[in-house]
Amino acid sequence: ALRTLIKAREQGLVHAVGLSGKTVEGGRLALSQGADCLMITLNPEQSDEKPLIDEAKNNGAGLLVKKALGSGHLTASIPSIFKDLFAHPSITSAIIGTISPVHLRNNCLALPTEIQQ
Protein backbone atom coordinates (compact mmCIF):
# COMPACT_ATOMS: atom_id res chain seq x y z
CA ALA A 1 0.00 0.00 0.00
CA LEU A 2 2.82 2.44 0.84
CA ARG A 3 4.43 1.91 -2.55
CA THR A 4 1.15 2.85 -4.24
CA LEU A 5 0.94 6.02 -2.15
CA ILE A 6 4.53 6.90 -2.99
CA LYS A 7 3.73 6.50 -6.70
CA ALA A 8 0.77 8.86 -6.22
CA ARG A 9 3.11 11.36 -4.56
CA GLU A 10 5.61 11.05 -7.41
CA GLN A 11 2.77 11.72 -9.88
CA GLY A 12 1.78 14.84 -7.95
CA LEU A 13 -1.56 13.40 -6.87
CA VAL A 14 -0.75 13.81 -3.16
CA HIS A 15 1.77 15.99 -1.36
CA ALA A 16 2.93 13.63 1.39
CA VAL A 17 2.38 10.05 2.52
CA GLY A 18 2.72 8.25 5.79
CA LEU A 19 1.40 5.46 7.91
CA SER A 20 1.16 3.91 11.32
CA GLY A 21 3.50 0.95 11.34
CA LYS A 22 2.35 0.00 14.87
CA THR A 23 5.89 -1.17 15.74
CA VAL A 24 9.40 0.25 15.59
CA GLU A 25 10.18 -2.22 12.81
CA GLY A 26 7.12 -1.15 10.83
CA GLY A 27 8.06 2.50 11.22
CA ARG A 28 11.63 1.84 10.14
CA LEU A 29 10.41 -0.02 7.07
CA ALA A 30 8.10 2.85 6.14
CA LEU A 31 10.93 5.38 6.52
CA SER A 32 13.26 3.24 4.42
CA GLN A 33 10.62 3.12 1.67
CA GLY A 34 10.19 6.89 1.61
CA ALA A 35 7.35 7.75 4.00
CA ASP A 36 7.09 11.49 4.71
CA CYS A 37 5.55 10.98 8.13
CA LEU A 38 4.72 8.33 10.70
CA MET A 39 1.90 8.02 13.19
CA ILE A 40 3.17 6.58 16.47
CA THR A 41 1.70 5.84 19.88
CA LEU A 42 3.53 7.79 22.56
CA ASN A 43 2.61 8.71 26.11
CA PRO A 44 4.08 8.16 29.60
CA GLU A 45 2.81 4.58 29.67
CA GLN A 46 3.40 3.61 26.02
CA SER A 47 6.86 4.41 24.70
CA ASP A 48 7.78 1.38 22.57
CA GLU A 49 7.88 3.53 19.42
CA LYS A 50 10.00 6.30 20.99
CA PRO A 51 13.13 5.29 19.00
CA LEU A 52 11.27 6.44 15.88
CA ILE A 53 11.44 10.07 17.05
CA ASP A 54 15.13 10.42 16.18
CA GLU A 55 14.87 8.12 13.18
CA ALA A 56 12.08 10.22 11.69
CA LYS A 57 14.12 13.37 12.30
CA ASN A 58 17.18 11.82 10.64
CA ASN A 59 15.03 10.91 7.62
CA GLY A 60 13.36 14.32 7.39
CA ALA A 61 9.98 12.80 8.25
CA GLY A 62 7.32 14.26 10.50
CA LEU A 63 5.56 12.50 13.36
CA LEU A 64 1.91 12.44 14.30
CA VAL A 65 1.42 11.12 17.84
CA LYS A 66 -1.72 9.18 18.66
CA LYS A 67 -2.92 8.38 22.18
CA ALA A 68 -0.82 11.24 23.56
CA LEU A 69 -3.08 11.43 26.60
CA GLY A 70 -3.50 7.67 26.91
CA SER A 71 -7.18 7.78 25.97
CA GLY A 72 -7.84 9.66 29.21
CA HIS A 73 -6.41 6.96 31.46
CA LEU A 74 -3.08 8.55 32.45
CA THR A 75 -2.26 9.87 35.89
CA ALA A 76 0.44 12.29 34.71
CA SER A 77 -0.56 15.94 34.39
CA ILE A 78 -1.62 17.05 30.94
CA PRO A 79 0.77 20.05 30.89
CA SER A 80 3.74 17.81 31.69
CA ILE A 81 2.71 15.33 28.98
CA PHE A 82 2.48 18.13 26.40
CA LYS A 83 5.78 19.66 27.52
CA ASP A 84 7.60 16.34 27.14
CA LEU A 85 5.84 15.51 23.88
CA PHE A 86 6.48 18.77 22.06
CA ALA A 87 10.08 19.03 23.27
CA HIS A 88 10.87 16.90 20.22
CA PRO A 89 10.95 19.08 17.08
CA SER A 90 10.16 16.15 14.81
CA ILE A 91 6.77 15.67 16.52
CA THR A 92 4.62 17.88 14.35
CA SER A 93 1.12 16.93 15.53
CA ALA A 94 -0.76 15.01 18.17
CA ILE A 95 -4.25 13.57 18.22
CA ILE A 96 -5.96 14.79 21.36
CA GLY A 97 -9.09 12.71 21.77
CA THR A 98 -11.88 13.98 23.93
CA ILE A 99 -15.42 13.30 25.05
CA SER A 100 -16.79 16.86 24.97
CA PRO A 101 -16.03 20.39 23.74
CA VAL A 102 -15.31 21.46 27.34
CA HIS A 103 -12.81 18.64 27.75
CA LEU A 104 -11.11 19.64 24.47
CA ARG A 105 -10.89 23.26 25.61
CA ASN A 106 -9.30 22.20 28.91
CA ASN A 107 -6.79 20.03 27.05
CA CYS A 108 -5.86 22.95 24.80
CA LEU A 109 -5.49 25.29 27.77
CA ALA A 110 -3.09 22.77 29.30
CA LEU A 111 -0.67 23.27 26.40
CA PRO A 112 2.45 25.17 27.44
CA THR A 113 2.20 28.84 26.44
CA GLU A 114 5.04 28.61 23.91
CA ILE A 115 3.16 25.87 22.03
CA GLN A 116 -0.13 27.80 22.00
CA GLN A 117 1.44 30.70 20.08
Regions found by a protein language model. Give the residues of each.
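Beta/alpha (TIM)-barrel catalytic core signal, keyed to glycine-rich beta->alpha loops juxtaposed to Asp/Glu
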Residues: 1-117
